[in-house]
Amino acid sequence: MKAQKGFTLIELMIVVAIIGILAAIAIPQYQNYVARSEGASALATINPLKTTVEESLSRGIAGSKILIGTTASTADTTYVGIDEKANKLGTVAVTIKDTGDGTIKFNFATGQSSPKNAGREITLNRTAEGVWTCTSTQEEMFIPKGCNEP
């Protein structure tokens, strides 16, 4: 009697079914992981700008000069030290009023970020008293840890 070589059709079908089940579970989890990491990357891009804004305001630079992502004639990106396209996932916009209140926003670009984040934004809000809060339009499970307010 000859020894069997190779695999039977049923064995191959079972392996294909197992791989299909694993892929059905793994791919959505991977997409969630990507969306969460994009949120963390966006927050890491804009968080250091809080220090830049505070330092500029403390040196007496008018808030209307601390702008990026705008065509305002008073805007001077040298105060911010970052380009609006500093992160390939989207754009950064800084708008601070002369009163000191304003926002630092990261807008996720469609086609550049994952579909779960496309068109959404993370915003750092500053009050005139210098209190910063963070808000996001992302789904709650994708909001980065440093931005706790939904």
Swiss-Prot record:
Spans through the membrane: none
Cellular localization per UniProt: Fimbrium
Keyword annotations from UniProtKB, A to Z: Disulfide bond, Fimbrium, Methylation
Source domain of life: Bacteria
Cystine pairings recorded for this chain: 134-147
Keyword Disulfide bond attached: yes
Propeptide: 1-6
UniProt record, GO biological process: cell adhesion; type IV pilus-dependent motility
UniProt cross-references to InterPro entries, sorted A to Z: N_methyl_site (IPR012902), Pilin (IPR001082), Pilin-like (IPR045584), T4P/T2SS_Core (IPR050470)
PTM sites of type N-methylphenylalanine: 7
Membership in a protein family: Belongs to the N-Me-Phe pilin family.
NCBIfam families the record matches: IV_pilin_GFxxxE
Protein name per Swiss-Prot or TrEMBL: Fimbrial protein
High-level lineage: Bacteria, Pseudomonadati, Pseudomonadota, Gammaproteobacteria, Pseudomonadales
Gene responsible for this protein: pilA
